């Protein structure tokens, strides 16, 4: 089978390389290309949808603000009452302002469609609603500040009055001890007693949890032991005295009594006349002389 050789010659007349002078390949993307008219139509539809959404949002926000203002005016306890102004009740001055704004409007452009502008009437309604909300917030803030000031003043007055009363009652309270409150005295135990007390408390708490014994308990376990402890002599700090300490105390008491008897015996008595003693002095001689005639009369 004969083979044909294909050769390419350079065409220098056109000034373009022959290798690069091929027709464009069909990649299949031509059907997905969109014309400029279709793009403009899509952008215009998108801008219209966004404008409608913005208008709906502004209307909903205005209605919410008016409802909030009405609720705040109902809840306010002050004398000043704020009324919600409907958006269709506009004065003549406001209409004049709207005309002046239509003649010289402030240009507000959107991002997608810069030729569209906001509605001046809509902007006026938004400004009215914002002014009402600002007034309401100012009134509420003033009321809160006044309430806070009054509460602070009352608290300061109460604190000063309480401090003055405490200063007046302190010196009396320091000297007077209420009889209803008993004085807590410390008690001393050795190591064996200490561990025994802990063991007893643990067992009692366990029984109280199981509701086997009542939680109300006496300050002592056994009445006889309590009486015996109350009779025992105590030393410094409420500690019980030992037998040696008790014997020494008895010896000191006996020595004190011996010294008193020795002084009474050996110190001479003062010679004091009865006239120098206080009180009326009775004369025994006169009493005897009075008794004699009575005896004579009785004998006669």
UniProtKB/Swiss-Prot annotation:
A single GO molecular function, which one?
DNA-binding transcription factor activity
Note the DNA-binding span(s) on this chain.
Answer: 218-243
Please give the PANTHER family that the UniProt record associates with this protein: TRANSCRIPTION FACTOR NF-Y ALPHA-RELATED
The answer on whether this UniProt entry bears the keyword NAD reads no
Q: Where in the cell is it found?
A: Nucleus
Q: Does the keyword Nucleus apply?
A: yes
Q: Where is the composition biased (Polar residues)?
A: 69-80
**Ranges spanned by the short sequence motif Subunit association domain (SAD), renumbered to the chain:** 188-211
Subunit structure and binding partners: Belongs to a heterotrimeric CCAAT-binding complex.
An example of a Gene Ontology cellular component annotation for this protein is: CCAAT-binding factor complex
The protein's name in its UniProt record = Transcriptional activator HAP2
The disulfides recorded in the entry are none
| Keyword entries, A-Z | Activator, DNA-binding, Nucleus, Transcription, Transcription regulation
Entry function: Binds to the upstream activation site (UAS) of the CYC1 gene and other genes involved in mitochondrial electron transport and activates their expression. Recognizes the sequence CCAAT.
What gene name is listed for this protein? HAP2
Q: Which family does it belong to?
A: Belongs to the NFYA/HAP2 subunit family.
Q: What SMART domains has UniProt attached to this entry?
A: CBF
Biased amino acid composition, Basic and acidic residues: 36-68, 284-300
């Amino acid at each position: 089978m004969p083979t044909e050789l294909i050769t390419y010659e350079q065409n220098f007349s056109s000034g373009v390389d022959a290798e690069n002078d091929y027709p464009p390949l069909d990649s299949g993307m031509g059907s997905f290309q969109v014309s400029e008219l279709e793009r403009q139509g899509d952008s215009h539809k998108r801008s219209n949808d966004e404008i409608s959404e913005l208008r709906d949002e502004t209307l909903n926000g205005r209605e919410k603000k008016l409802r909030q203002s009405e609720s705040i005016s109902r809840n306010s306890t002050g004398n000043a009452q704020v009324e919600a102004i409907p958006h269709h009740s506009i004065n003549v001055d406001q209409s004049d302002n709207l005309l002046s704004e239509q003649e010289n409007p402030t240009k507000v452009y959107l991002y997608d469609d810069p030729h569209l502008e906001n509605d001046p009437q809509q902007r006026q309604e938004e400004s009215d609603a914002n002014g009402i909300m600002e007034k309401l917030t100012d009134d509420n803030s003033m009321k809160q500040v006044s309430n806070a000031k009054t509460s602070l003043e009352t608290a300061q007055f109460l604190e000063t009055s309480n401090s003055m009363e405490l200063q007046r009652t302190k010196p009396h309270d320091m000297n007077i001890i209420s009889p209803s409150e008993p004085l807590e005295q410390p008690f001393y135990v050795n190591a064996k007693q200490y561990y025994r007390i802990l063991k007893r408390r643990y067992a009692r708490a366990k029984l109280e949890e199981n509701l086997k014994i009542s939680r109300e308990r006496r300050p002592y376990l056994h009445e006889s032991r309590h009486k015996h402890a109350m009779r025992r002599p105590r030393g410094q700090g409420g500690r019980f005295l030992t037998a040696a300490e008790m014997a020494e105390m008895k010896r000191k008491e006996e020595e004190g009594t011996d010294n008193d008897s020795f002084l009474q015996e050996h110190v001479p008595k003062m010679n004091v006349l009865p006239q120098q003693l206080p009180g009326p002095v009775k004369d025994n001689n006169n009493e005897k002389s009075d008794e004699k005639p009575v005896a004579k009369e009785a004998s006669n």
